[in-house]
Amino acid sequence: MKKMASFSLTTLLKNLGKHHKFLVAFSGGLDSTVLLHGLLSLRDQNHLKLNIRAIHTHEKLIHRPENWSKDADQRLTHCQSQCEQWKVPLEVVKMEVEPRGKGIEAAARTVRYQIFSNALKKDEVLLTGHHQNDQCETVLLALKRGSGPAGLSGMPLAMPLGQSQLLRPQLSFSRHSLQLYALEKGILWMEDEDNQNDRFDRNFLRRHILPLLTARWPHFLESTSRSAALCAEQETLLDELLSEQLCQLQSQEGTLSIQGLAACSEVKRNALLRRWLDSKKVPMPSRDQLARLWKEVALAKSDAQPYLQCGEYQIRRFREHLYLFKSSKKSQPCPALFSIKWPFTPESENKLVLPDHLGELKCTPYRSEGQVIRAPQKNEVISIRFGLTGNIKILGRDRSRHSKKLWQELGIPPWERKRIPLLYFNETLIAAAEVFVTQKGEAKQGEPHCYLEWVKS
């Protein structure tokens, strides 16, 4: 028994890498309690300079029974008592979760990890107590969903979290080995009563399926972890092999060439599409969604405006390229009659916060990266509007163009046109931010001028 505990500590130290500042996600359960105790043992026994803190989320899940809140209070009291006894600084963050379109556990997990990310200090990494049983459950759930190698890779030992990292240093330990360690060291922990609820798939696997599998095949957990690691290796290899071509198929704006994809086999094309979407942090689409993306969006007629909704994202086609963006931000045009008056001081930097997550405009007499325009006269009212109409004559063009024709010639996608800020002096259009300056907005030599810059959110 001592040999197992010692081995666990040695492996734990190896899995921590070169980091020495840790924030432990501490729930008071077996996994996080053993993790915290193990860290303290490594620090004290090996005289290591480890900086250890703990964080506990005191959760209130809306639409849950009242006794659940009482359990949460009991867990908080236990965590505070344990950290006080071990002299570990504990940060407690209250969180309230209401599921919207997600299951309550998924919604809570999203909020929880955002809290963890915000709590991390400089050079600090987050540690969670996930173990081999958790990894096996993750792989089995991915198998149930029909996932490919990416999903079957399970949870990585290390992954990015905000500006830092998340480490799972106990992934190579079974829950049974953690329990033996806790019993040997006389460690107390709290069992989460929610873990007995078979309504959740993980609990069903944990309580009914894994015991059968490990009873029949004692090394099933280790074998599953090995398979997950092999799947992860294959995904890493594919990333390396396809990264150069994916880079070649992307424009500077991050759009993806349909013509380039069409030259690939279906298998390679799907792999490239998955990596493109993953690079944009989009939830991985199903095989059917990828097929629809190619047939209904990429191969649609040139005059059509098809799109595929993928969670909160939209994928659209324009001029032989695929575009991706959050639909909550870019799918809805700003009202054409919408107008914002801009208080303006010609001699200083002027800023205006735009509506609907569009960022802000800056206009300054000092040299900047923006468009050069003539300065407004004292009697001119400055405003920002949306929705270009009529004929417009812009710099660099001899003849005026109708707004629709002009947008087409400039290569502006249809869904972006009514979200581009238009700068007016009185009723005169001066510029479309980042796109063009009209002839009436020209900054002539020797006359006052300023610089217009659009800082997007």
From Swiss-Prot:
The keyword tRNA processing applies. Keywords: ATP-binding, Cytoplasm, Ligase, Nucleotide-binding, tRNA processing. It catalyses: cytidine(34) in tRNA(Ile2) + L-lysine + ATP = lysidine(34) in tRNA(Ile2) + AMP + diphosphate + H(+). GO terms for biological process: tRNA modification. Signal peptide: none annotated. ATP binds at residues 27-32. SMART domains: TilS_C. It comes from the Bacteria. Its EC number is 6.3.4.19. GO terms for molecular function: ATP binding; tRNA(Ile)-lysidine synthase activity. It is found in: Cytoplasm. The keyword Ligase applies. GO terms for cellular component: cytoplasm. The N-terminal region contains the highly conserved SGGXDS motif, predicted to be a P-loop motif involved in ATP binding. Ligates lysine onto the cytidine present at position 34 of the AUA codon-specific tRNA(Ile) that contains the anticodon CAU, in an ATP-dependent manner. Cytidine is converted to lysidine, thus changing the amino acid specificity of the tRNA from methionine to isoleucine. Belongs to the tRNA(Ile)-lysidine synthase family. PANTHER family: TRNA(ILE)-LYSIDINE SYNTHASE-RELATED. This is tRNA(Ile)-lysidine synthase. It comes from Hamiltonella defensa subsp. Acyrthosiphon pisum (strain 5AT). The lineage of its organism: Bacteria, Pseudomonadati, Pseudomonadota, Gammaproteobacteria, Enterobacterales.
